[in-house]
Amino acid sequence: MIPTRKSRCALAACAVALGFRVAAVSQDAAATAAGMQVEHATVAPDAIVHPFADGADQADALQRALDALQRGQRLVFAPGRYVVGRSLAVKQANVAISGYGATLIATDPDDQTIEMRGDGTTLAGLTLAGIGATRLTTPASTKVDVTGRGVQVLDVVIDGGASAGIFVFGGQDVAIVGNEVRATLADGIHVTHGALNVLVQGNVVRDTGDDMIAVVSYRNDGAPSGNVLIAGNSLEGNDWGRGVTVVGGADVTIADNIVRGVRTGAGILVAQEDSYRTYDATNVRVARNVVADIQQRASRQAGRAQTGQAAIDLNAGSGAVTRVDVTDNRIVDARFAGVRTLGNVCGVRVSGNRLDAIGGAPIARESRGCAAGQAIAGAANTLNGVALPPPARVGSQAVAFAVSGADETRMPRVRQWLRQVRGRGALAVER
């Protein structure tokens, strides 16, 4: 997907040619592959790159520095501004790229990503300034493209870009933690192509052109994405799309997030879509989220039609959405319904949710095709502080819908030793 160069050189020779120095003190790094963490491995010293003083395009030099890394080594970007005229690829396994205080400035909307191809690699601390006035759909137009296994993207700031901010394309055992994504023309964070065991935690996403966080499983992927934990993120404002969405996928948990200011769609959507030929969605937990200011007139973008979706919307086309638990969420200021089930949506529990200032039905039951007692169950929901009746007659409710969501024991451990508090050089606190 990304053009790469095959030139290689010894570390010392590259240091002279590229103007970067080798740190005098070795680091304790992680050699992580296939989800296995090996801490404090003996590795080569840090390699350090510096921005060109004249502001010239540095992409070729940076790619040579990346290619020269040894397994387990870290490349440190010294603080400053780096002009990068094409995409970069991290190909070596078990290396770390650290850039706290460094900004990479893209100049080509079609070719501006950092592809994290090597297994067990880490990208931490960089600020990526994107470019683009027209929305694009290619991996090379994203800002970070995760294709390897055991990849972690930590504390990266993405400002602008023609496509998605962070694009997880088939990666496994991936951690997307502590990042800030703003003003991309497509999704903020997008997980697809059969990605497995993905942690999306503690990120801030603002003002995107489409979904702020999305898990999408297309039939052409060959397998649905699964075991995804979306937790503790702060999301606000997008021109189109939803806040958090699972459109096809299995074993997903959406918990403890704040979702605000979604202008045209649902705050949280779990769906199967015919128009995009997606897989069904099943075994999804939606718990303890705050969902507010959804499709309000004052925030609507001119020329963008509102979808009429609920604040938390579960819907299916010709496929199915099954086994969804919507529990203990706070839903405030939604123009349409609070929670809705639409189409072939069965095995849903809606319990313990607090709803206020809802413009439509608090719980809209529009499911079809479900067996008796298998459409919706639940209790203890409130509207404006007043208890709501159960979403189905007690006698018709199924005894239990088995919904577990993501298996958190299979999530990757975050490489905290590679993180810093911005501007202070100290280790970050685990999110």
Feature names for model-found ranges:
Residues 47-78:
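Acidic Gly/Asp/Thr-rich repetitive segments characteristic of extracellular carbohydrate-active
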Residues 73, 85-87, 106-112, 132-138, ...:
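Short glycine/acidic-rich loop motifs that flank beta-strands on beta-rich extracellular proteins
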Residues 98-103, 119-130, 149-160, 172-186, ...:
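Right-handed parallel beta-helix
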Residues 29-48:
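N-terminal low-complexity, Pro/Thr/Ser-rich intrinsically disordered segments
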Residues 27, 31, 346-431:
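Acidic, glycine- and Ser/Thr-rich low-complexity intrinsically disordered tracts
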Residues 12-21:
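Bacterial N-terminal signal peptides
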Residues 63-71, 82-97, 104-151, 165-168, ...:
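Extracellular beta-strand-rich solenoid/capping regions of secreted or surface-exposed proteins
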Residues 2-11:
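Bacterial N-terminal signal peptides that target proteins for export
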